[in-house]
Design a protein with these regions (language model features):
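Flavin-binding catalytic cores
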Residues: 71, 97-102, 107-151
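Short, solvent-exposed loop/turn segments at secondary-structure junctions
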Residues: 4, 35-38, 70, 93-94, ...
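An active-site-proximal "capping" alpha-helix that borders the catalytic cofactor pocket
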Residues: 185-186
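Central helical "cap/lid" subdomain
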Residues: 22-76, 137-140
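Short hydrophobic/aromatic beta-strand or adjacent loop that forms the aromatic wall/cage
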Residues: 60-64, 85, 102
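FAD-binding beta-loop-beta segment adjacent to the flavin cofactor pocket
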Residues: 92-100, 144-173, 177-179
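Generic structural signal for small/hydrophobic residues in well-ordered secondary structure
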Residues: 30-32, 65, 105, 145, ...
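A conserved short coil-to-beta-strand element within the FAD-binding core of flavoproteins
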Residues: 2-14
Length: 186
């Protein structure tokens, strides 16, 4: 169910969905969505709508692959930040992960923007080829592959809104766009 707006009535919040169904009442609401989706929800809360309206996000493609054998590369993670690739990581090098040859590939925002509507299989092919170039080795055909497009992958600029809240109204906002583009900032 997609919530389209928040309404404050008698010191409580009601959520209105795309079918105009009313949900609630709620004493408090936490808005944990990208700024483009948060701004319309926060329209009635002046000190919260401005940060959401003035923040933008960049897209990204993430690809997960499993290879049939271990790559002959000492690299476990590489910040590439050029061409199609921003980051590649060997998952088995992380504590507590499976020993299979799983990799995560993340695109640069500019490349993702240029390829937003491409077929996911084409995205996998392009990023795997770029990975081979970065590592300087042949990458065998993956036995598993999956691509996911993130329209709102990370903040377009560094931001330091910090905690966004109107506690007197019982509304709180969180997300990486409030403090920075990495998981810990969310």
């Amino acid at each position: 169910t997609r919530i389209e707006r928040l309404e404050r009535q008698a010191q409580q919040w009601h959520l209105v969905d795309s079918q105009q169904t009313l949900h609630g009442p709620y004493d408090q609401v936490i808005v944990a969505v990208p700024p483009a989706q948060a701004a319309p929800l926060l329209a009635g809360v002046a000190n919260l709508v401005a940060p959401a309206s003035n923040s933008s996000m960049e897209p990204g493609w993430a690809v997960a692959i499993t290879l049939p054998q271990k790559l002959d590369s000492s690299a476990d993670a590489v910040f590439v930040r050029s061409g199609p690739l921003d980051w590649i990581a060997r998952e088995a090098s992380k504590p507590g992960r499976a020993n299979s040859e799983n990799w995560v590939l993340q695109s640069t925002p500019a490349w993702a923007e240029a390829h937003l509507d491409d077929d996911p299989a084409q995205i996998v092919d392009a990023l795997v080829a770029a990975m081979g170039e970065v590592l300087g080795i042949h990458i065998p055909t993956p036995v598993f592959q999956q691509a996911h497009r993130w329209l709102y992958a990370r903040p377009a600029a560094d931001c330091e809104w910090g905690a966004l809240a109107a506690p007197e109204q019982g509304i709180y906002v969180c997300g990486d766009w409030c403090l920075g583009g990495r998981l810990g900032a969310a």
